[in-house]
Amino acid sequence: MSEQKLAVNEYLKTDSDYLRGTIQEGLDTAVTGAFSEGDQQLIKFHGFYQQDDRDLRNERKEQKLEPLYSFMLRARVAGGVCSPEQWLAVDKIASNLTSSNSIRLTTRQTFQYHGIPKRNLKTIIQDLDREALDSIAACGDVNRNVMCNPNPVESKLHQQAYAYAKQLSDNMLPHTKAYAEIWLDDEKLVTTEGEEVEPVYGKTYLPRKFKMAVAVPPDNDVDVYTNDLGFVAVAEGDELVGFNMVAGGGMGSTHGEVSTFPRLADDFGYIKAEDTLKFAEAVMTIQRDWGNRENRKLSRLKYTIVKHGFESFKAEIEARTGIKFEPKRDVVIGDRGDRYGWKQGVDDNWHLTLFIEGGRVKDFPGQPLQTGLREIAKVHQGDFRMTSNQNIIIAGVPSADKALIEGLARQHGLLGKLITETRGHSIACVALPTCALAMAEAERYFPDFLTKVEALQEKHGFLDQGIVIRMTGCPNGCARPFAAEIGLVGKAPGRYNLYLGASFEGTRLNKLYRENIQEAEILAELDALFALYVAERQAGETFGNYTVRSGVVAAVLDAAKDFHG
């Protein structure tokens, strides 16, 4: 590979002294609310992005002021599990140190803060550290937050799967001490020439972000096939014995560039549970060594597998682990939604899944959600589990405490509102006004849009049936829109590409149906399609499957060839 061809980020990483850069100097500079251009890339590895309020951008420009810079900080919480004590600390930070005064639950089972001024970053990170929470590797060219099915019913199997998710998260952490030095005031370590600081990542880390998930069938709430690397649990009775390993998924693409495409992961085969970390490290180091470092748009693992071929990639995994894949075991991949309301686990404790619209934990008029969760955390003795559908589970509630928890939830608007199957299965990214990449609205607009879709479902007599609908402000795919039965991807303000045809279970991608259309056109298209669906559907046929069977869109079987074709 010619050095001149490397992406700019590769030089930044090489010259950063293992992710230190000049972040400390930027932190000490009060004349601007921003970091330098290079450090804006490095701070991602520390868990946050620089943003500005796009609603105020033009106004501030007219006033000859710099943009209203702030930061989005994302925590690393493997499997989305935290204690009530941790939640109270998370809540206090949101209320006292961010301008958004809210907590945003993400599509990868963690939380993030928006509207953090630069001067508050260090305080927030130190406050999180006191509660054994951090933001290391929550962003950047590293392994991101590891997802795991929260599975509030099969609690024994969940605990086993969660243990592996936690190990994967801990083992794939960067080894650099930059985070501790800059944010936690640890003494700077002096490394000697040739010392191996990052035994897995190396000096330039990965070519691009890397996402892992652990699924516990039949649930596929973690959308395992959309991840770079996924482990599908195989159980014998209540015991986890191994995983079907999948690799090569990813949602991001670029409008108008057919060389980029979303992709679902390939099935590689079955591995024993005790070999999980070996296989994860093998896949990650192959991506480190083989991944594209010249063009970041083509640097995710999915492109590496397409370029080198499935068999070649599989052979390299087996060579690096010294272990052959066994044939994949039969498992059933089912629903991607959450189980709302109360469910009793095998340990006789109860688990309450609460719907959080758009993942935004905030005190809304008539719905003081943030206060409600705070009050629950003060009395709850179990744990809080964030889901990949942006919801939260109050887990491990003894029967004696059930009425207390439910009363608090109802009192604060966390329970009592009717949630349709479609709304309960649907998610959106943050988008405007904070995300720099957003081309259109998502979180702020999505609830009202869903209400109009629900009205169409009611008109056609199938409101009781769920459709997976997802909306993002751009094609980077944070809310996994290309794996939705109805995917809406922002193209311009008020305009979206409409994608149809993904499977309800998340095992097939969707395909572009209409491009760059406004709400009225979207709803008109769905109105007509819903009428056909009700008239022509087969018994038990989901909307996504109908659109493929009836020829509304072609099935995407090989994303590299079919997604744009």
From Swiss-Prot:
Chain's gene name: cysI
Similarity annotation: Belongs to the nitrite and sulfite reductase 4Fe-4S domain family.
Major enzyme class: oxidoreductase
Complexes and interactors: Alpha(8)-beta(8). The alpha component is a flavoprotein, the beta component is a hemoprotein.
Gene Ontology annotations for the cellular component aspect, listed alphabetically: sulfite reductase complex (NADPH)
Hydrolase in keyword set: no
HAMAP family linked: CysI (MF_01540)
Names of the cofactor(s): siroheme; [4Fe-4S] cluster
Source organism per UniProt: Shewanella pealeana (strain ATCC 700345 / ANG-SQ1)
Organism domain of life: Bacteria
Pathway assigned in UniProt: Sulfur metabolism; hydrogen sulfide biosynthesis; hydrogen sulfide from sulfite (NADPH route): step 1/1
Binding site for siroheme: C478
Pfam family, any one: NIR_SIR
Keywords on record: 4Fe-4S, Amino-acid biosynthesis, Cysteine biosynthesis, Heme, Iron, Iron-sulfur, Metal-binding, NADP, Oxidoreductase
GO biological process terms held by the UniProt record: cysteine biosynthetic process; hydrogen sulfide biosynthetic process; sulfate assimilation
The name this protein goes by in its record: Sulfite reductase [NADPH] hemoprotein beta-component
Cystines in this chain: none
Reactions that this protein is recorded to catalyse: hydrogen sulfide + 3 NADP(+) + 3 H2O = sulfite + 3 NADPH + 4 H(+)
EC number in record: 1.8.1.2
Residues the record lists as binding [4Fe-4S] cluster: C429, C435, C474, C478
Cofactor: how and how many bound: Binds 1 siroheme per subunit. Binds 1 [4Fe-4S] cluster per subunit.
Role played: Component of the sulfite reductase complex that catalyzes the 6-electron reduction of sulfite to sulfide. This is one of several activities required for the biosynthesis of L-cysteine from sulfate.
Listed GO MF terms: 4 iron, 4 sulfur cluster binding; heme binding; metal ion binding; NADP binding; sulfite reductase (ferredoxin) activity; sulfite reductase (NADPH) activity
SUPFAM superfamilies, per the entry: Nitrite and sulphite reductase 4Fe-4S domain-like, Nitrite/Sulfite reductase N-terminal domain-like
